[in-house]
Amino acid sequence: CVGEVSAEVKQLLKTTKESLYKAILTAIPGKRLGDIGYAVQQHCESQGYGIVREFVGHGIGRTMHEDPQIPNYGKQGTGKQLKNGMCLAIEPMVTMKSPELYMLPDKWGVITRDKLPAAHFEHTIAIHHGKADILSTFEKKKKIEGHLY
């Protein structure tokens, strides 16, 4: 633990995490990429937060970052249609206020231009049997290990 955070930061974290799960619930066959982004955007912006637009979720497969790109904003019913067999990294990135970012001189670190906190949660999912299955959870690992011993 790195210390306590303010109630405002706790709410930012809670809202960002909630938006991740709302997006995951949206990721079913027949829906579209815009539906995922809309779920994140609507939930976060309705509470006054900003949505990072420079970084997005993505497909994942033989390589870490594959198409399609999955923005955390969007219009319902737009974008590529979701199908069984797709593996996606959904990763809401949400700011306390302004969504504008600044790249640090090291070309790795990124901060918000207004220097206020931001939050990022991520899960990798596989769409199959008509629903999104979360792959990046320790529950899955526990189930696999349980079968090994």
How should these model regions be labeled?
Residues C1-Y149:
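Active-site neighborhoods and metal-handling regions in enzymes and metal-associated proteins
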